[in-house]
Amino acid sequence: MFQDNPLLAQLKQQLHSQTPRAEGVVKATEKGFGFLEVDAKKSYFIPPPQMKKVMHGDRIIAVIHSEKERESAEPEELVEPFLTRFVGKVQGKNDRLAIVPDHPLLKDAIPCRAARGLNHEFKEGDWAVAEMRRHPLKGDRSFYAELTQYITFGDDHFVPWWVTLARHNLEKEAPDGVATEMLDEGLVREDLTALDFVTIDSASTEDMDDALFAKALPDDKLQLIVAIADPTAWIAEGSKLDKAAKIRAFTNYLPGFNIPMLPRELSDDLCSLRANEVRPVLACRMTLSADGTIEDNIEFFAATIESKAKLVYDQVSDWLENTGDWQPESEAIAEQVRLLAQICQRRGEWRHNHALVFKDRPDYRFILGEKGEVLDIVAEPRRIANRIVEEAMIAANICAARVLRDKLGFGIYNVHMGFDPANADALAALLKTHGLHVDAEEVLTLDGFCKLRRELDAQPTGFLDSRIRRFQSFAEISTEPGPHFGLGLEAYATWTSPIRKYGDMINHRLLKAVIKGETATRPQDEITVQMAERRRLNRMAERDVGDWLYARFLKDKAGTGTRFAAEIVDISRGGMRVRLVDNGAIAFIPAPFLHAVRDELVCSQENGTVQIKGETVYKVTDVIDVTIAEVRMETRGIIARPVA
């Protein structure tokens, strides 16, 4: 009799509309209960039985119950699931399979089966890609997943690489395809094969993008020719190879190996500027005045060159610093190295005075055995030879940015707008508390930004610099010319790595149109979105593989008294993140390791400090000694403890 009662339906509707609800993200804990985080300040308790309906990271709407002053959340509706496609480890075998997602806060095995047409008999320990098919908040009885791809077996030494690439849905190998002959582009190529061009790279580099030639001119001027590998001489726009490169957008550099954007035959051979091999190039000729200014007579042209020597960073640096036993093979090569060092010096000074120079941070290199084991991790400081190449490339990219802006009005530009205008007042207020006075309007201009950066660089520590990083906007890829505040430049467009960056290939085609006096089509904005997304995924992949290898490397140090110098990089409510100075590993120090009495401890992300009994004991950028307390291989987490 109550079945179709309109009054009852109305009452139900009223009760439903009056019941308090909240939307937020589920945060799981290791204790079985969880929280519904509505915003930074408000969260609701989710009891263990209710947590069985949801997963860490799910965005849900929940009913809020109040009992005895305590509020709790009952999940009601799924807004956005945390897991859709994921990687994990298979449990069980054949007809009774489950998969445990590879995520630090997802511990429960999800029942699953292999998708139709997937011809692999899954067994315990296998790694797989899965997709969620059922969710309790969608009216299903339980969670259920489908295995869509076999990655590798559990004991494969190369699990970190294969699992990471599958997680981010990235290619595992070089693209297929060959380029048999050069295109007829209607370009006249200048013959520069007689000039003493040199390449400077790591000893193991095969994909040499750039060769340099320097010459002294009257009036204390210097000429620099930057010659860049020319893959667009082989790859036609819109061709199969071009489309593959467009999707990949970049060569993916992972510890131990790379997955190239172009077929290796092109990247490591036909286009690579190998010593004593004639190669087509796109080149830029520029004149530098005595103070390092790039004069206005910039010239882009097509050419053929023959590199006369493959030089190695460390050997060149040693020779310039009068150490080591390496010698240039001829006086002509020695003269090139001396002139290039002079150019580097001038350009470095010019950028220091008129733009911005990054602080040198070492690169960390993993030395791996044949089975992917980490033999060592070495810090490679950026030395004079690295800076020679860097200054030449930055100068060449400044030239391209100017020419594309003035001749076409578009290109693929790296744009960085400095501080987000919405943060300008907060930034000025923060700086004021540290004794630096800036105008909130001025700091949004390129000159104002550069002025502030120079003041920050002159500070005794990097603490204040670390505090203002959160106010900065992100660098973007744009088809529109715009400033790059981070470099302190009015415009910056890269073209010096076309073997490994698709955006540089686009700029090559645009520069060739300028050389030939032809009209060019503006690149579509979608390509910049694809490039930004690929760059993000590649960086995440590099970080994930690195985390795995760091965990492997430091595992046997856990529980020993081995000390490591570590820089504090971040402070949060739960503790501190530190970077080990010698090898670059990131470790976490939980708050209880800092001080036993929680009420006397304040970890402030806002201030970048840790206070104990009101005294600042640690701050971001401090370098402290730590030992490794624990390495959790299943989450690749490294837990450290400060040395008392």
From Swiss-Prot:
It is an enzyme of class 3 (hydrolase). Residues 189-516 form the RNB domain. The keyword Ribosomal protein does not apply. It catalyses: Exonucleolytic cleavage in the 3'- to 5'-direction to yield nucleoside 5'-phosphates. SMART domains: CSP (SM00357), RNB (SM00955), S1 (SM00316). Its main location: cytoplasm. GO terms for biological process: mRNA catabolic process. Its EC number is 3.1.13.1. Transmembrane segments: none annotated. It holds the Pfam family S1. GO terms for molecular function: exoribonuclease II activity; RNA binding. HAMAP family: RNase_II. Belongs to the RNR ribonuclease family. RNase II subfamily. Involved in mRNA degradation. Hydrolyzes single-stranded polyribonucleotides processively in the 3' to 5' direction. This is Exoribonuclease 2.
